[in-house]
Amino acid sequence: MTGKICGTGSWAPDRVWDNNDLAKMVETSDQWIRERTGVVQRHIAKEDEDTVTMAAGAALKALEDAEMKAEEIDLILVATISPTEIMPCVACGVQERLGAENATCFDLNGACTGSLLALNTAQAYLAQGIYRNALVIGAEKLSGLTDWTDRGTCILFGDGAGAVVLRAEEGGSYAQVTHSIGKKGGALTLQSRNQIRYENDPKAKETYIQMNGKEVFSFAVSKVPEAVKELLSREQVSCEDISYYLLHQANERIIRSAARRLGEDISKFPMNMDRYGNTSSASLLILLDEMKKSGKLQRGDRLVLAGFGGGLTYGASLIEY
């Protein structure tokens, strides 16, 4: 059994901040941001728009696309590093809003690799016949975890959610490789805010996303192509057999570098970070939804999905659409 993609959806806040808005907050410019990241704008959630709001919004659209009722879903898995609450989990909040009373629900924290890890997890459950219909969501409200005085990070991130409905069916194919490098975890961190015990705690700065940009960039441009090559080699699939490579939308330069290292044309690497920025766990599923809605995906297409991020973690999966 394999989880077949039968519906996708995405949701982003209406409020948009472009690069010129950020130039009023920190020393930067539209040109500087575009040249280094490819980002032009990002969606920023309002106070009453939390991770559950976005996750449920994307999930509803995915269910509509799949022509499936919420009661038919028996697994809801949410990848996020920005939950509204530690408990209950975001997935339970989504269950409540959808009325998916038959679903088992839990969250997964895999940072920017989160949606890939969530897909792997859901596929494993479906393959074993434990569940029949899975709703996988990546949702982030990164604006609340971003230091808006730090030019090195605030230009990157945005808010949003993506979702996919997987139905267990005979046939199809799914394969994946994932790796973790815990010893390099310090390159990209977000300290728990539960550790702040008193006012004016000197650790307060650490409660925002902290990143060694050069180290993360070097990691991504080398390890992502490495994972893709490992996956295709193991599955005895050539690059020519791949219709599209959907990579985590962190930085345009990373994706262009991956295309070069794989010897593939950049046209096979769709990008949308110009409109969303880096949405961490949400980015792959937002991109997948846009590809489906635009009519670019055809049944039988072979897709490579690749993620990389905090941990450090990285990996790739091969799925037949």
Protein language model features and the residues they cover:
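Claisen-condensing/thiolase-fold acyl-transfer catalytic domains that form or cleave C-C bonds
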Residues: 52, 56-59, 63, 82-83, ...
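Short beta-strand segments
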Residues: 79, 109, 134-140, 166-167, ...
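Condensing-enzyme catalytic core mediating Claisen C-C bond formation in acyl metabolism
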Residues: 1-47, 150-218, 222, 226, ...
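Flexible, glycine-rich active-site loops centered on histidine and acidic residues
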Residues: 127-161
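Short glycine-rich phosphate-binding loop at a beta-alpha junction
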Residues: 71-79, 239-248
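Short acidic, glycine/serine/threonine-rich loops at helix termini
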Residues: 16-17, 87-89, 146-150, 314-318
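Conserved beta-strand elements of the Class I
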Residues: 4, 74-77, 135, 243, ...
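Acidic-glycine-rich active-site phosphate/pyrophosphate-binding loop
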Residues: 26-35, 85-99, 135-142, 195-202, ...
